[in-house]
């Protein structure tokens, strides 16, 4: 079981546009965080396996302003997955504000579909700790 993660402290920058990309291979079926930006318990951004779907969520003032979960299941322990999350909350159309791609295919069948409001601060580039492969000492990515 994994018990380590990478951390860095983000600096100020845009909080409305970003692209996250990772190649991952799961070793088990538990909930695991790929990326977690912990601005505070009230303001954070995360990308995770939940446990076999891919979820992306932003909390702002303790309310979920974005929550997307794929309907497709990703549970093959021998498969590599290329995951891309593209966010641009400045877009006029809500479904263009956040997109999840797996192995080059946009995931349009979603079990959770709360898109961010236009120009929403997504809390992913604030001066706070960014965790890659975990969530503040827990939910490590095991892969």
Which residue ranges define each predicted feature?
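Extracellular glycan-recognition modules
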Residues: 2-57, 91-94
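Short tryptophan-centered beta-strand motifs in secreted/extracellular beta-sheet-rich domains
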Residues: 22, 78-89, 100
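Surface-exposed loop/edge segments in extracytoplasmic proteins
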Residues: 43-45, 63-69, 106-111
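Beta-strand signatures of extracellular beta-sandwich domains
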Residues: 55, 99-101
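Short, aromatic/His-centered strand-loop micro-motif at the edge of beta-sheets
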Residues: 57-82
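Short, solvent-exposed loop/turn segments that connect beta-strands within catalytic domains
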Residues: 61-65, 90-96
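Short, solvent-exposed beta-strand-to-loop segments that form ligand-recognition rims
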Residues: 102-128
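Extracellular glycan-interaction patches encoded by glycine-rich segments
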Residues: 123-143
